[in-house]
């Protein structure tokens, strides 16, 4: 049984990364934070089911990925999508508050615009720094499928970002 200070240490180590992962799935910071909080509660309540044969980082990432997918299928998410279509200005203002207007924002937006399957593997590969074999295992798909989704995702990103004059390159 985990002690509270052990759980706090785990949360300090993983929370920021897990929120970022959830955000890339659900595209909303508040929902991402809620998802991570739910995952920690589930992890604490069901810790006897956790087998320490794998990495805790991968286990928590899997929980966040699954919970994010559940959220995307939920009625709550669909209701928010309808509200954002009715009140689009609020969505734009909220997003501007969350993300800085720099090259990273352009890349993040391009990633968020990717189809779900490509976005999912791009996030795990580049942001979670997971090798292809681990992504395949996490998503229960063949390695070749992961590689194909990575290649297609990169191609789509290249198309989306080819018109950008990168500030960092202009000052070299």
State the predicted function of each range.
Residues 1-8, 79-82, 137-140, 154-172:
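C-terminal edge and immediately downstream basic/flexible tail or linker adjoining helix-turn-helix-like DNA-binding
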Residues 1-20, 36, 44:
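A short, charge-rich alpha-helical start-of-domain segment used by transcription regulators
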Residues 18, 22, 47, 60, ...:
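Hydrophobic-face residues of short alpha-helical interaction/recognition segments
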Residues 34-41, 54-66:
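Structural recognition of an alpha-helix C-terminal capping motif at a helix-to-coil junction
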Residues 48-62, 77-80, 143:
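Short, aromatic/basic-enriched loop-to-helix "N-cap" motif that marks the start
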Residues 65-83, 100, 152:
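Arg/Lys-rich amphipathic alpha helix in sigma70-family domain 2
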Residues 78-107, 112, 131, 170-171:
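Internal acidic/polar
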Residues 121-125:
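A short pre-motif secondary-structure segment
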